Amino acid sequence: EINILNLNNDNNEIPNYGWPQASYGRHYFDNNDDNDVRYKLSPLKDSHSKYGFVEPLKYFTPSVAISQIIGVDKNFYNTDGNALFVGTMGTAKKLKEGMLSLYFFELKDDKIIKDQFIPIKSRVRDIIYNKENNYLIMYLETNNALAVLKKS
């Protein structure tokens, strides 16, 4: 899940995003056995708002194994709002659509107004934004390589 921490809300409360009571994901110990006592001790609710929690900005089901979320300068994509890149790693056992990739999100008023999926075909372990030269440097774990993403 991606959450925007907003401490400037109307009632001066610290927002609660629900973990570990609410999540669109599954437990780390997930063995697909709903009779597992751990599910009874800490069930996950699919809805956040229904239980008084803040809904996430974005969630991925199944999980894409987010490695890093990094904000970039408005000049990187000529946006009016904020822009984020999200690196993903996936798992060695079950690769699914959206894993081993990079996501771009343009935000305005804490809402996604544009998103882009960029297939990388390698685990994106780390991302650095070079603001001075306006490009991203990524460490790709699967290939043991560095990659540069620059606006064309």
Where would I find each of the regions flagged by the language model?
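Beta-propeller domain segments
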Residues: 1-113
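Generic preference for flexible, low-structure residues
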Residues: 33-35, 118, 143, 152
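A generic structural signal for well-ordered alpha-helical surface patches
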Residues: 100-103, 122-125, 144
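Blade-level signature of beta-propeller repeat domains, shared across WD40, Kelch, NHL, RCC1
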Residues: 128-152
